Regions:
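A residue-identity detector for tryptophan
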Residues: 7-9, 24-26, 33, 50, ...
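Hydrophobic membrane-insertion alpha-helices, especially the h-region
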Residues: 14-45
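Short, solvent-exposed recognition patches
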Residues: 76-153, 250-333
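A compositionally biased, intrinsically disordered/low-complexity signal enriched
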Residues: 99-101, 110-112, 161, 167, ...
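A short, solvent-exposed beta-edge/loop patch
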Residues: 145-215, 304-370
Length: 370
């Protein structure tokens, strides 16, 4: 038997050495590939996208609708995280759950707060509170079958919205008969235009739908939102020309459009020089018992009395088809002390006109007034 090595001529390469070299090259290439792939994954932006998507899936149990958030905020990336609820002295939204979605640098975001109906004081506070001390707040209905309202945050072009979702499977539970979803936005671009307002409203109601499923609230959804009413918070309507929430009131006013499902309505009665004399509001559903917890109403508004007049606050109520009585209230605003209405007759008349029309619109009866 002839040794293989004897058949190889002097100077021929060693086959074993060649195989070893190829093996080393393959190992080196594999090591380079193992090291390079994570780098490519990271620097290509795929890693950031993966992290963003993973965070959004865990935020508010994945209920936040992010399909239009980038356009809404004016950012290229969004990431989400849950937030601990504020348990301070003032009622704040988010006692059930709270989260935020926005740019990783924190310069633009939307916060989502979830509350059961028994904690409605927090959502009302975050929506604006409607304290008797300020000439602010104009709830605009989302319409399209949604029990929700939209407003601009005072002094900004940012938006806030709240939606009430009655839970058909929780009707007998006084604390959680409905789910309240409150969304606040802070963008790098204005949210004041029609397209942005509609985008914000769509994100709010879609998030509310998702949250109702995640928190076991069997609710009926409204329709698709293509547009929402324009903001009229600073639009003065001449005397006798009111067509919305102030219709029937003969003075100059500021008002919003009406909707039979709006849980909050506002009408501002103006003096001759355009200064607000008093704000008349309607509250339905869980917001009725939430108002006395707002700053300025403690010891003044008695929710157990169907009607009253105390310390410059007039209120009445009506029995509604669902969720008890509605509240109709008029508060005198700063700068209104010099108005000519010594007996309050004009204010009582305006409250009566407002309450009669609002209660009829919502199908309520047994209206009682001071």
């Amino acid at each position: 038997m002839v040794d293989v090595t004897e058949q190889r001529r002097i100077g021929d390469p060693d086959p074993g050495a060649a195989r070893l070299k190829r093996k080393r090259l393959l190992i080196a290439a594999g090591v380079v590939l193992v090291l390079a792939v994570p780098g490519i994954f990271y620097f290509s932006g795929a890693y950031d996208s993966w992290q963003d998507n993973r965070s959004l899936a865990d935020t508010c149990r994945g209920s936040v609708d992010t399909s239009e958030v980038k356009e809404l905020l004016g950012v290229d990336r969004v990431r989400g995280h849950d937030i601990e609820a504020d348990h301070g002295s003032s009622p704040r939204a988010g006692q059930l759950h709270k989260c935020s979605v926005g740019a990783p640098d924190g310069n633009a975001s939307v916060s989502v707060s979830l509350d059961w109906s028994g904690d409605a004081a927090g959502p009302l506070h975050d929506f604006g509170g409607f304290t008797p001390y300020g000439d602010v707040g104009m709830a605009t209905p989302l319409k399209h079958g949604w029990e929700g309202v939209l407003d601009e945050v005072s002094g900004t072009r940012n938006l806030v919205a709240t939606v009430n979702l009655p839970c058909e499977n929780r009707r007998t539970d006084a604390r959680s008969s409905s789910l309240l979803v409150t969304v606040q936005g802070m963008g790098t671009r204005s949210m004041g235009g029609a397209a942005q307002r509609a985008r914000f409203a769509r994100m709010t109601v879609k998030t509310a739908q998702n949250a109702s499923k995640a928190w076991d609230c069997a609710s009926r959804a409204g329709g698709e939102i293509e547009r929402v009413p324009d903001s009229t918070a600073h639009t003065q309507v001449p005397q006798g020309e009111a067509r919305g929430t102030c219709v029937g009131i003969k003075t100059a006013v500021r008002e919003s459009v009406t909707d039979a499902k709006a849980p909050i309505e506002n009408c501002y009665v103006l003096a001759d020089r355009g200064v607000s004399q008093y704000r008349i509001s309607a509250f339905y559903g869980p917001f009725v018992r939430a108002l006395p917890a707002q700053r300025g109403y403690s010891g003044v508004l008695d929710p157990e009395k169907p009607a009253g007049n105390k310390d410059g606050v007039l209120w009445g109520s009506a029995k509604c088809p669902s969720e008890g009585r509605a509240l109709y209230i008029s508060t005198r605003l700063p700068g209104a002390a010099d108005r000519f209405d010594p007996d309050g007759d004009a204010e009582k008349s305006a409250l009566k006109t407002f309450a009669m029309r609002s209660s009829k619109r919502h199908g309520c009866e047994d209206l009682q007034l001071p």
